[in-house]
Amino acid sequence: MSLAPKKTIDDAVVKGKKVLIRVDFNVPVKNGEITNDFRIRSALPTIQKVLKEGGSCILMSHLGRPKGAKMSDPKPAKSVRGYEEAATLRPVAARLSELLGQKVEFAPDCLDAASYAAKLKGGDVLLLENVRFYAEEGSKKEEERDAMAKVLAAYGDVYVSDAFGTAHRDSADMTGIPKVLGAGYAGYLMEKEINYFAQVLNNPPRPLVAIVGGAKVSDKIQLLDNMLGRINYLVIGGAMAYTFQKAQGHAIGISMCEEDKLDLAKSLLKKAQERNVEVLLPVDHVCNKEFQGVDAPLVTKDVEIPEGYMALDIGPKTIKIYEDVIAKCKSTIWNGPMGVFEMPCYSKGTFAVAKAMGNGTQKNGLMSIIGGGDTASAAELSGEAKNMSHVSTGGGASLELLEGKSLPGVTVLTNKE
């Protein structure tokens, strides 16, 4: 577990320095317009801290999944190596400039930006073009990542990482630069992520409930295995619940089920029992014959799902039980929705869990942490995200932490003495 306390931007001397900040500006862009700027706004406190202290910022990010060119490729006459219109960070520079209320310089080639960096004075901001326009950024070969890192590191004096969402990947800009510069500091967003996950994994207020949903048991095996040694209650929802229920001998109709994981489900339930973890599975379901929204889906009377029906959300009795468990806990970690929340008729379970967590946090001081990805989207959609202690910005990164893995992009940062 790489969650030792890290030196943060507050420990770094930034006055008069050029500060390289790896941010996460991987925002949704449609026809050149940013449709959600949450990630840009999330990075502002770290950027503003550097500017206030008299430093300048050199910002690096990826956007989307461009194919990426090689550093050795010849430069095209009128364009940039690896350039893809759909993945340019140019619209982000414009939006960031509005949010900061100052000009943000834009370097159209992240590996040919030395002249831009050289001109920076205290209080200036420079955004480099998409680092993933170069294949070396996330290359499997360390020497290729390091070659790119050396070019980027030469632009600045201090390295700050504020991109928790990509901390589970070894890359030129997440792990390469701090190795070249010999130190790395956590930005405010990264610090918050590390602190909340360290608390829930190492020393949570108890009782602690893990709420785990989503489609497949196979996606969450390591998470369940690791968390069973740390939690008091395990609440299971989403399609993965039906694999557990079939393993217990219940009828699941035509609900999604991983037939080859039934023995695994049994062994996880046995392990929970041995560790005194109370496991809660749905006792009723919201069903339909087809995977589509309907005005009046079937609600089962009990745990059994009738033949020809698939369960697509947890039922009202289950919601009540899950709400009661959340109400008696002091910490919650939630990863994975309870049903097909994108369809309103199957969103009640997911939104009820979000509401119970939001209420508990605001009224009873519950520590509520939401893993990123779908769960964060569901919390946003329910209107409860603002009421949680912490909504993680990293889907893959938060999942790997909950699985007990260390994150390369966190491990590489300088430890607090």
Curated annotation (Swiss-Prot):
Record bears the keyword Signal: no
Organism, scientific name: Crithidia fasciculata
Binding site residues for ADP: 214-215, 220, 238, 311, 335, 341-342, 374-375
Domain remark in the UniProt entry: This cytosolic PGK lacks a C-terminal extension of 38 AA which is present in the glycosomal isoenzyme.
Name of the protein described by the UniProt record: Phosphoglycerate kinase, cytosolic
Requisite cofactors: Mg(2+)
Binding-site positions, ATP: 215, 220, 239, 311, 342, 374-375
SUBUNIT field: Monomer.
Swiss-Prot/TrEMBL catalytic activity: (2R)-3-phosphoglycerate + ATP = (2R)-3-phospho-glyceroyl phosphate + ADP
GO cellular component: cytosol
Positions with a binding annotation for (2R)-3-phosphoglycerate: 23-26, 39, 61-62, 64-65, 132, 168-169, 216
Xref: Pfam families: PGK
